[in-house]
Amino acid sequence: MKRVFHILASSLLLLTLILSFQSCEQSTEVGKPPSNGQANFTSFVAIGNSLTAGYQSNALFQSAQVYSFPALIAKQAGVTDFQQPLISDPGIGIGIEGRIRVTSLSPLKSVYDTARGQPTNINLPRPYNNLGIPGALLWIPNQSLAPISDLTDTSDFGASPTRRGNPFFQIVLRNPALGKSIRQQAAALHPTFVTLWIGNNDVLGYAATGGGWVNGNKILQPTPPQMFSSLYGKVAAALKQMNPNIQVVVANIPDVSAIPFFTTVPPYILNPQTNQPIIGNDGKPMHWLGVNDGDLVTLRALSLIKSGYGIPQILGGNNKPLPDSVVLDVNEQATVRGAITAYNSAIASVASQNGFALVDAYSIMNELKAHGMLIAGQEFTAEFITGGFFSYDGVHPSSRGYAIVANEFLKVINQKWNANIPYVDVMSVPGEPLGKRPFTKGLPNIPKEIIDRTVELLLP
């Protein structure tokens, strides 16, 4: 009997140890103490757009900014004075529509805050370490095709709330005495280590508007690949000018078809009672009017579908097709894929030429979409809301999603600079423990204003 007891006790101890390792994430390389190795975080600067800022659920707010991937990297590396443009809750979004909050999962319903937060450390007498600006573009489109970038543009950033409807350039850069551009403010910090993730919006704006439809006109195109390559090379050169020994980690551009904004609404008509596709006389699911095989229907279609668009009159609709602006057809998808392929080739080339480390966000996001990720028993997928990785706007990660991103950066940093920086314990980051749970009652119910503001953030 004692032998049986000892066997059971040993088995329980082993099981406890296994579960402990699973729940804590991979903290350090086995047998090797935590170390920054040759990575020099003396002055750590993060450059990029909303993904760097920690933007999520259509707003920038402090309780999420503390989980931006640069802030998490800084914490894991022992950086004690990593400053960000923190905004009190409920935060600030685009327009009067602010942070999204989900009020029901079955059916999925959400609302938005109209209250606004305020910057909490606007008087910091130096530039912020996190210079990620939501809406930033590598190339600012202009008729003369001049190589102007949001990273180097020294025009009056204080005018951006009026000129572009974007308050974040003013919020992040604040004071021209600290530098008139992201580049100048970054240089003022004399960086030793930089993360650079830029270029997503150079193609995402085109995709999110169904192929460039803005105010009824098809006017937007992805940044030309040659322009992207040239400007990215100039950004790399500028970083080298700041510090010849600078250490840089760059990330490439994910496939837009991997994010819920383009994958949540199916191409076929759903029966609102069963949440299953309506089958036509040919025995196949009936597509929304205006949608063909292979097309991606964006979240912007939700309010139109609710009003009867895309639905034949016999099924209770208004018999009008979904407009092109809410559908990314197969030809437009080819344009997007071509741009992303060219951008990622340029990023890889510039990284190789300059000795920068590279995070392959493209492959990581496609893996998440195809197979998901199992972390401490929690399944993360690319599903809208319930997948756990994305926030309520369908474009940006959640806090736990950003923790996963931080760990992907840390993997590359550890390998490149012989470091052993502990990974972030993803499950210790706030998040809704939903796992993979499908919506049970039809399509999500999201106010049109919220989705429109998410798209506006991506436009020049």
Per-segment meaning from a language model:
Residues 1-11:
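Bacterial N-terminal signal peptides that target proteins for export
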Residues 19-23:
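C-terminal motif of bacterial Sec signal peptides marking the signal peptidase cleavage site
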Residues 25-460:
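Conserved active-site regions of diverse hydrolases
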